[in-house]
Regions:
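Hydrophobic core of transmembrane alpha-helices in multi-pass small-molecule transporters
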Residues: 24, 107-123, 257, 341-359
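Structural signature of the two symmetry-related core transmembrane helices
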Residues: 84-98, 313-329
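Glycine-rich segments within core transmembrane alpha-helices of 12-TM secondary carriers
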Residues: 144-162, 385-395
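Helix-to-loop junctions at the C-terminal end of transmembrane segments
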Residues: 68-81, 166, 298-312, 403
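Helix-loop boundary and gating motifs at the non-cytosolic
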Residues: 9-65, 248-288
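Cytoplasmic helix-loop-helix junction between adjacent transmembrane helices
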Residues: 116-150
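Central cavity-lining transmembrane alpha-helices of secondary-active solute carriers
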Residues: 55-74, 289-301
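Juxtamembrane intracellular "pre-TM" segments in multi-pass secondary transporters
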Residues: 4-14, 197-253, 441
């Protein structure tokens, strides 16, 4: 296999990144997917059971990403056909989306949502590898930024379509899965036409060697394995807690656990809460759209904002901003009744899911990038991915039960408290040395 620097000596060639636009239709299709599934489960089962089933669906969706990442990682190592895997992934997503319309059972809905989680990961790594395999190294950063932007804009357009659909056909939400499936087929066809198999292939670990590729891959899905972590890897990751010299990595993992448990708790119950307060489906999609739009814009400036500041400080700022937003939504859920709940949701959710997430994500993944390069990359990334997957799954699973039996406001306030706890943990991290900072360049 060639190294990631293998193309550095090539003569300048025109950019061959038109294939990146094949990701746009499927991003449109999957942008509103989680919201659609949650609303549909409530339609099928009512508010209480629909919320619990929504939590179960989200938990399985997050949990299945762990074996999916392992399976597709091994497949990529053995089958060096980028175009085939990407086209197959999109086609399988299309089949799963269209099948929502024909099997309208709760079990079938949860199963298909889980299938989409599994098959969509087949394309995440090949897409990022293709950039490094087909573009000159000087163009990598720009190509990764374009891939991220095209995907995000697709999600925004998908949510915008959902807002219009919910206004025109409010009783036919399930029918929306059919055009979303057609868009996925379009992406599959475009990938076959536009993607050219690279002249040389790279190993998966090269994605962890460069910050742009590392960030873009984790943004697509934060679960990414180079090797399968062993029990000793987990023990080593948390063993240094007792010493002030070695506690940085364990504290970082603990703060990550708290963040993703909090995210699972909040995100799983947020849509059902709006439905409980008689917020229309159109307005629900509009709130999620606002969050995605702000997130897309925030990521365009987050790198520059974080780059000039201490990483621990910016991580704390992102956590505090998100935590106070969650707490504000929790207080609103406690004090308000009826559709007026959409007002604080429309203000605070874009702050939490957009601006605060972009700041925290950029800061935390920069620290993770440093961790990967200061230790065994495969082990460190494997532990991180397992931690993220399990934490997200756990938060999603208990979210529905807490909301139904104790109240949605309890779920949201607890989500904020967990983030404040993460602030206390991450605030104990040692400030990065100049050596660490240079490793991030």
């Amino acid at each position: 296999m060639n190294s990631c620097d293998g193309g550095s000596g090539l003569m300048a060639k025109p950019s061959r990144d038109k294939w990146l636009y094949s990701t746009f239709p499927i991003s449109v299709a999957t942008g509103p997917l989680g919201t659609m599934v949650q609303l549909y489960l409530i339609q099928l089962n009512g508010q209480a059971l629909g919320t619990i089933y929504g939590g179960l669906a989200s938990a399985i969706y997050n949990g299945i990403s762990i074996p999916a990442a392992l399976f597709w990682g091994l497949t990529i190592d053995r089958l060096h056909k980028r175009k085939g895997l990407i086209a197959l992934s999109y086609a399988m997503v299309a089949i799963a989306l269209v099948s929502f319309y024909f099997d309208r059972s709760t079990g079938g809905t949860i199963a298909r949502y889980s299938v989409i989680s599994f098959v969509s990961l087949a394309s995440a790594t090949p897409l990022n590898l293709l950039i490094m395999e087909t573009e000159q190294k000087s163009r990598w950063a720009g190509a990764f930024a374009k891939l991220s932007l095209v995907s995000s804009l697709g999600n925004v357009v998908g949510l915008l379509v959902s807002v219009v659909w919910a206004d025109l056909l409010p009783a036919q939400l399930v029918l929306l899965f059919v055009p979303m499936g057609a868009l996925s087929v379009t992406s599959s066809a475009l990938s076959v036409v536009l993607i050219k198999e690279p002249e040389f292939v790279l190993e998966r670990e090269t994605l962890a060697a460069r910050r742009p590729s590392f960030f873009t891959r984790l943004l697509a899905n934060p679960v990414f394995f180079i090797t399968i972590p062993s029990l000793s890897d987990f023990r080593r990751a948390f063993r240094g807690m007792r010493s002030s010299l070695t506690r940085g990595v364990p504290l970082f993992y603990i703060s990550t656990i708290l963040f993703y448990v909090s995210s699972g708790l909040f995100n799983t119950s947020f849509v059902p809460a709006m439905h409980l307060y008689s917020v229309s489906d159109q307005e629900v999609f509009a709130v999620i759209l606002a969050g995605m739009a702000v997130q897309t814009l925030s990521f365009q400036v987050a790198g520059r904002f974080v780059g000039d500041r201490n990483l621990v400080t910016t991580s704390v700022q992102g956590l505090l901003l998100r935590g106070w937003s969650y707490l504000g939504i929790g207080v609103a859920a406690l004090l308000l009744t009826g559709p007026i709940f959409v007002a604080p949701a429309l203000v605070l959710y874009p702050i939490a899911g957009g601006l605060a997430f972009a700041i925290y994500y950029t800061s935390a993944n920069t620290m993770m990038f440093t961790t990967v390069h200061s230790k065994s990359a495969g082990a460190a990334l494997g532990v991180y991915s397992a931690v993220v997957g399990i934490a997200s799954m756990s938060g999603s699973f208990v979210s529905g039960f807490i909301s139904v039996y104790d109240g949605y406001y309890v779920t949201f306030i607890l989500s904020g408290v967990l983030l404040f706890t993460a602030v206390a943990v991450i605030g104990r991290l040692p400030k990065p040395s100049s050596r660490d900072e240079s490793a991030l360049q």
